[in-house]
């Protein structure tokens, strides 16, 4: 009677006898391959990019530099922080100076944005121009940027503020640097003299 039920339902007798899903997975090479791929991807997701987990240093990156104390820079002082003269890489955006050393692959000498290292990158980022000619050697007040370019620059400023350490500001010629205390709160030079 059981054989008649199988014939009546149209089911394959081997499916009813075996392990069902497990039988399907382990008897098909394609399913085995997909299962292996799923396990590998799950392992990569769970394990993630744990630093030092593999025991080797893939990129031969130098050890991280200590955090730079907050200070202000003239365009000439900023220029030496290009990743060549000094291992640290600084960039100015919208009057703010950021330590972008951890982004060496992008902003280092061989990176796609290496032209901005040690410079005020505001004009280049606002105009989407990676030419060295777009950058000025002296302080750039950016007064000739269009509203759309100013908005683009503001977006870059927000991204850098979120991602990189803000180490100070870019000084105009003749501007006095801000004195920063150990807790990195700015104090004007005149307020400091009155104490």
UniProtKB/Swiss-Prot annotation:
The modification Phosphoserine is found at residues 54, 181. O-glycosylated; contains chondroitin sulfate attached to Ser-54. Ser-54 is in the cytoplasmic domain but the glycosylated form was detected in urine, suggesting that the membrane-bound form is cleaved, allowing for production of a secreted form which is glycosylated. Belongs to the cytochrome b5 family. MAPR subfamily. Gene3D superfamilies: Cytochrome b5-like heme/steroid binding domain. Residues 44-195 are cytoplasmic. InterPro entries: Cyt_B5-like_heme/steroid-bd, Cyt_B5-like_heme/steroid_sf, MAPR/NEUFC/NENF-like. The keyword Nucleotide-binding does not apply. It comes from Mus musculus (Mouse). The chain crosses the membrane at residues 25-43. Residues 1-24 are lumenal. It holds the Pfam family Cyt-b5. Homodimer. Forms stable homodimer through hydrophobic heme-heme stacking interactions. Interacts with PGRMC2. Interacts with FECH; the interaction results in decreased FECH activity. Interacts with EGFR, CYP1A1 and CYP3A4; the interactions require PGRMC1 homodimerization. Interacts with TMEM97 and LDLR; the interaction increases LDL internalization. It is a single-pass membrane protein. It is found in: Microsome membrane; Endoplasmic reticulum membrane; Mitochondrion outer membrane; Secreted. The modification Phosphothreonine is found at residues 74, 190. SMART domains: Cyt-b5. GO terms for cellular component: endoplasmic reticulum membrane; extracellular region; mitochondrial outer membrane; neuron projection; neuronal cell body; synapse. This is Membrane-associated progesterone receptor component 1. Heme binds at residue 113. Non-classical progesterone receptors involved in extranuclear signaling are classified in 2 groups: the class II progestin and adipoQ receptor (PAQR) family (also called mPRs) (PAQR5, PAQR6, PAQR7, PAQR8 and PAQR9) and the b5-like heme/steroid-binding protein family (also called MAPRs) (PGRMC1, PGRMC2, NENF and CYB5D2). The cytochrome b5 heme-binding domain lacks the conserved iron-binding His residues at positions 107 and 131. One of its GO terms (molecular function) is heme binding. Residues 72-171 form the Cytochrome b5 heme-binding domain. Disulfide bonds: none annotated.
């Amino acid at each position: 009677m059981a054989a008649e039920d199988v014939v009546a339902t149209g089911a394959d007798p081997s499916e009813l006898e075996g392990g069902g899903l497990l039988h399907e997975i382990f008897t098909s090479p394609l399913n085995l391959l997909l299962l292996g791929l799923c396990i590998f991807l799950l392992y990569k997701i769970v394990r993630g990019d744990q630093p030092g987990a593999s025991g080797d240093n893939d990129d031969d990156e130098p050890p991280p530099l200590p955090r730079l104390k907050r200070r202000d820079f003239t365009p000439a002082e900023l220029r030496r922080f290009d990743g060549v003269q000094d291992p640290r890489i600084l960039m100015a955006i919208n009057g703010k100076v950021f330590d972008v050393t951890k982004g060496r692959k992008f902003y280092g000498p061989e990176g796609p944005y290496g032209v901005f290292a040690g410079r005020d990158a505001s004009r280049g980022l606002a105009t989407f121009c990676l030419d060295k000619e777009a950058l000025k050697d002296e302080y750039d007040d950016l007064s000739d940027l269009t509203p759309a370019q100013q908005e683009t620059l503001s977006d870059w400023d927000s991204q850098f503020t979120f991602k990189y350490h803000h180490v100070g500001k870019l000084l105009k010629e003749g501007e006095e640097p801000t004195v920063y205390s150990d807790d990195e709160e700015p104090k004007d030079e005149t307020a400091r003299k009155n104490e």
